[in-house]
């Protein structure tokens, strides 16, 4: 039920005309709460008249299935310490646990927990293997 609500809300937000003005950034994962911020360029940072930012924030902060939201966003391990190991199946409909650090799930559905090797592209949701760092936030390379 929580997944259906999540998909419905994401579709509603994506179809909103104000959504094109939103730059949505995941700021931090902290315990079981996902903290997000929404902003518009050249705006006074006040809330949107159509309630879009409130809807997005509510989706992330008050989701009934935080483990699923965490896993779908980043594949990071859950606060209780349980996670999916290297090359193990992961994704929506497979498990509500995330991949062990620094791995991420290769696909939202029926993926495998992997990390990005040296010299390969990395970024916000594609983490480098242990001992490597990504030199860019979105279009970096593991070094």
From Swiss-Prot:
GO molecular function: sodium channel regulator activity; toxin activity
Main subcellular location: secreted
Propeptide: 19-80
Span of the signal peptide: 1-18
Disulphide linkage map: 83-100, 90-105, 99-113, 115-129, 122-134, 128-142
Compartment annotation: Secreted
Gene Ontology BP annotations: defense response
Keywords on record: Disulfide bond, Ion channel impairing toxin, Knottin, Neurotoxin, Plant defense, Secreted, Signal, Toxin, Voltage-gated sodium channel impairing toxin
Record's keyword annotation contains Secreted: yes
UniProt function note: Plant defense neurotoxin that causes pain and systemic symptoms in mammals via modulation of voltage-gated sodium channels (Nav). Potent modulator of human Nav1.5/SCN5A (EC(50)=55 nM), Nav1.6/SCN8A (EC(50)=0.86 nM), and Nav1.7/SCN9A (EC(50)=208 nM), where it shifts the activation threshold to more negative potentials and delays fast inactivation. Also shifts the voltage-dependence of steady-state fast inactivation of Nav1.6/SCN8A, but not that of Nav1.5/SCN5A or Nav1.7/SCN9A. On Nav1.7/SCN9A, principally acts by binding to extracellular loops of domain IV (Nav site 3).
Domain notes: The presence of 'disulfide through disulfide knots' structurally defines this protein as a knottin. This toxin contains 2 'disulfide through disulfide knots'.
Family according to the record: Belongs to the urticatoxin-2 family.
Name of the featured protein: Beta/delta-urticatoxin-Uf2b
Organism annotation: Urtica ferox (Tree nettle)
